[in-house]
């Protein structure tokens, strides 16, 4: 396919979870930078970044160091998932069948769907409150519908439109946050801007964990946005475009939140602090962030839809849905989330975020297994046809080795967890720091490798696997 033909690709995406033929690939690797840079300059990462100085009482310097370390570490895992896209040509969650089996992958896929539905619902509530904050005459429920409709339309149109919006958003939001930094730093209203807080190792670890988990949360759908790139796009270029875009964008947003709350008197809500600290530009900054929420939330809807379709296709293996099916599922999720968000109690977002944090615990072992399997064991060579078979083809319905490593990866995290839904005994000795994700990664990775390489079925799978690039039968 020539560049002109690729640029002429239809705006409305026709694929869902099926294999993307080499002739249908399009786009440039730099699109991944703009997608993840623009998508991460938004209220939620700003609020999360402020927690290091608000909740864990770090000063600005140590807060920034913790943010940078967490983003740098978590971004590696996130970008390694992204680099699988051009090599495989299929969405991330359906590719998990190669590790867990056609039925074994169902649990992880359902969890991913629930998590991204939760993200979508919580973000439309945030969008509704933002609309009300900008124009008080607009009720929050109306604002919720406005935010949901905007994200829903973007998600239904699909991949190409999402990339176009984020190419524009990178420039607009990049300039906006740069001006915002200048306004805050030139109008600091506190005498303790640099001295408020201090250094506490436990608080520093907790901030690193929050920062790293922000990146890891993208892992189940990050390659959904790189799978359309031409198959000759290398792993390294995909990795670096994603890594730099996501880590730079989210690091700027995290630091912006920390700077904003330190520039105003202690105790102020983060977004109120942003509005006050940026002075006359405050309302404009809120408008930019609202547009960012709407655009970025389309990724959550898109990822949720693909995960739901993947789950259903497990039991209807001959069904490779089209754009119409994707639109129908999008509308169902959209309506359900609007209904729940409008009719729920005031602590809806808080409860939803608590659930999402708990679900991250079960996604960390999946991340470890997926990356070890792709890069170390199979080295990117898979039988794509088997992934779409009812019996899993050479991968089977269940992979006991992956499921055992997965279960152990969850269990070992439990004592280290510190979420609103459950707190293990160890965080109390670490000042509340939740290191469960790190423990899960460090145990699951070598355990899965050890189990997989000693399994005779693994050798059969490896011998039968073919490169995605050479497979032309899946439509």
For each of these PLM feature ranges, what is it?
Residues 1-62, 203-209, 227-237, 455-475:
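Membrane-interface "cap" regions at the ends of multi-pass membrane proteins
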Residues 29-46, 181-187, 196-260, 279-301, ...:
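Hydrophobic, membrane-embedded alpha-helices of multi-pass small-molecule transporters
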Residues 128, 142, 146-184, 198-199, ...:
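Membrane-interface loop-to-helix entry segments
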Residues 171-197, 212-216, 255-263, 368-380, ...:
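Hydrophobic alpha-helical segments and their helix-loop junctions in multi-pass secondary transporters
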Residues 262, 311-346, 394-413:
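Loop-to-transmembrane helix boundary motifs in multi-pass membrane proteins
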């Amino acid at each position: 396919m020539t560049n002109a033909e690729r640029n002429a690709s239809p705006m409305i995406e026709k694929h869902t979870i099926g294999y993307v033929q080499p002739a249908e690939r399009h786009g440039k690797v730099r699109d991944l930078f703009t997608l993840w840079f623009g998508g991460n300059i938004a209220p939620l990462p700003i609020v999360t970044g402020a927690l290091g100085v608000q909740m864990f009482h770090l000063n600005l310097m140590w807060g920034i160091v913790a943010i940078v370390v967490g983003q740098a570490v978590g971004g590696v895992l996130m970008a390694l998932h992204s680099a699988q896209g051009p090599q495989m040509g299929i969405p991330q969650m359906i590719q998990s069948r190669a590790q867990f089996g056609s039925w074994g992958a169902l649990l992880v896929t359902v969890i991913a769907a629930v998590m991204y539905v939760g993200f979508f619902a919580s973000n439309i509530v945030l969008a509704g409150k933002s609309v009300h904050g900008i124009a008080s005459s607009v009720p929050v429920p109306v604002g919720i519908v406005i935010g949901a409709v905007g994200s829903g339309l973007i998600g239904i149109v699909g991949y190409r439109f999402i990339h176009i919006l984020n190419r524009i958003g990178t420039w607009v939001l990049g300039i906006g946050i740069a001006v915002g930094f200048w306004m805050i730093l030139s109008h600091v209203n506190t005498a303790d801007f640099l001295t408020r807080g201090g250094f506490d190792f436990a608080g520093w670890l907790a901030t690193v964990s929050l920062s790293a988990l922000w990146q890891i949360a993208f892992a189940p759908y990050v390659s959904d946005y790189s799978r359309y790139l031409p198959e000759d796009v290398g792993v390294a270029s995909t990795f670096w475009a994603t890594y730099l875009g996501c880590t730079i964008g989210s690091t700027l947003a995290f630091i912006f939140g920390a700077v904003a709350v330190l520039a105003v008197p202690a105790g102020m809500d983060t977004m109120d602090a942003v509005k006050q600290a940026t002075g006359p530009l405050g309302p404009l900054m809120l408008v930019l962030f609202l547009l960012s929420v709407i655009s970025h939330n389309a990724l959550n809807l898109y990822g949720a839809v693909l995960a739901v379709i993947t789950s259903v296709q497990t039991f209807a293996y001959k069904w490779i849905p089209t754009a119409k099916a994707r639109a129908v599922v999008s509308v169902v999720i959209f309506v359900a989330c609007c209904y729940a968000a409008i009719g729920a109690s005031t602590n809806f977002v808080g409860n939803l975020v608590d659930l999402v944090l708990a679900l991250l615990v079960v996604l960390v072992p999946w991340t470890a297994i997926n990356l070890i399997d792709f890069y170390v064991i199979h080295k990117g060579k898979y039988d794509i046809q088997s992934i779409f078979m009812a019996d899993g083809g050479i991968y089977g319905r269940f992979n006991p080795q992956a499921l055992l490593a997965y279960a152990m990866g969850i269990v070992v995290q439990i004592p280290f967890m510190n979420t609103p839904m459950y707190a293990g005994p160890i965080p109390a000795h670490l000042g509340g720091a939740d290191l469960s994700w790190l423990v899960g990664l460090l145990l699951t990775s070598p355990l899965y490798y050890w189990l997989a390489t000693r399994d005779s079925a693994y050798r059969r799978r490896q011998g039968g696997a073919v490169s995605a690039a050479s497979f032309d039968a899946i439509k």
